[in-house]
From Swiss-Prot:
Official protein name in the record: Large-conductance mechanosensitive channel
Top-level lineage group: Bacteria
SUPFAM superfamilies: Gated mechanosensitive channel
Cell compartment(s), UniProt: Cell membrane
Length: 127
């Protein structure tokens, strides 16, 4: 049973998926830090010049006693767009590499005259 689990766990697809999940989680933290520390302050500075003292991170309104935090939503959308763009570039690079490999793969040579004659004989014998 352990041997079967070991074979399953160390197959390429499962191991690749595990590595992808771990790297994705780490990348998500990097994007969150980038948005929190760099992008949102820049957007806040630009909007504060236009709207006077605006901090997007604290944008919210309340319905009754429930706060609706629009700033958090905007921050999350920006994070999503960054991750989606990076993944788009990654997939685009992989696809272009695959296309190059497909083009570089040599086509099978046409069958020789002998093979064509043998096929004709085979086909005529099958009739």
């Amino acid at each position: 049973m352990f041997k079967e689990f070991k074979e399953f766990a160390f197959k390429g697809n499962v191991l690749d998926l595990a590595i992808g999940v771990i790297i994705g989680a780490a990348f998500g933290k990097i994007v969150t830090a980038l948005v929190d520390v760099v992008i949102m302050p820049i957007i806040s500075i630009i909007l504060s010049l236009i709207l006077n003292d605006v901090n997007i991170a604290t944008w919210q309104f309340s319905i009754g006693a429930t706060p609706i935090m629009i700033g958090v939503l905007i921050k999350t959308i920006i994070e999503f767009l960054i991750i989606a763009f990076v993944l788009f570039l990654f997939v685009k690079g992989i696809n272009s590499t695959r296309r190059k490999q497909e083009v570089e793969a040599p086509a099978a040579p046409p069958p020789s005259e002998e093979v064509l004659l043998l096929r004709e004989i085979r086909d005529s014998l099958q009739k």
